[in-house]
Amino acid sequence: RDVERSRGLGDVYKRQIEHMLFKGTDNRTAIEIAGEMDGLGGNLNAFTAKECTCYYAKVLDEHLGQAVDILQDLVQYPRLAPEDLSREQGVVCEEILMVEDSPEELVHELLGSAIYGESPLARPILGSQESVRAFTPDRLRAYMARRYQLGQMVVACAGRVDMQTLLPLLEAAFCKGEKALPAPGEDMPASQLLQGQRFVAAQKDVEQTHICLGFPGFPTDTKEQFALYVLNNALGGSMSSRLFQHIREERGMAYSVYSYPSGYSGTGYFALYAGTEGKQGAKVAELMLQEARRMR
């Protein structure tokens, strides 16, 4: 686990497991999972973020029980077959290459590395091709045994929901008489923003320069984050925002320009982004800073 901590492999495990859970379980093949959900006219998907993985289904209320059963099957009885893992490692490696070939995506990964240095939050969720190729089914199972526990699970349900129907379904699917154990400690203490100015760049043979400027923000568990959401909407989070109006609409110097907050447990940052012609990069960065200062 020391190696995992130092390299921030927790995120990579999460992403690989997310892919693998749709490849079949002890009770359903991959095509049966897809066919059963399609037969309900529903949607089954997942996503991995820096601090969580979410598996979700969207169905008619009359199919709630089947949706819970499928989700339970995915997270509790994954097949994790070696041949499936080998194929999926190739898929994830191709996804890594896709990000490398997309400067508009890559620049946000570079911003994270500049802000968080050697902490796990600096690492891309997809990992590297080397780390992805190193996984085995046993390593994935060990990670799931440690992390996919009742004490770390959060269930959310919205829509036409009858709680008297839902709760027994969830208890039967996930509790089974077991008590929720305390969640194990995090792989790494909450990361702090690096101090001082930092600059990271990647040279790509493309037409545009993609710029991200990062500033200290707020953790997800603070009241200040809500004020930051309001500020974001005014600065770069909408078509009427200052960045959009002054850089795109008035000057025509960028097609894509925006801002966004990024919060985690114990830390967070605020970012500005623009993609522009190379020779305009310095000027656009200056204009972005000017608009940010005007918000004071």
Regions found by a protein language model. Name each.
Residues 182-241:
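His/Glu-based metal-binding/catalytic segments typifying zinc-dependent metallopeptidases
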Residues 244-245:
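Phosphate-proximal small/polar/acidic motifs at interfaces that engage nucleotide phosphates
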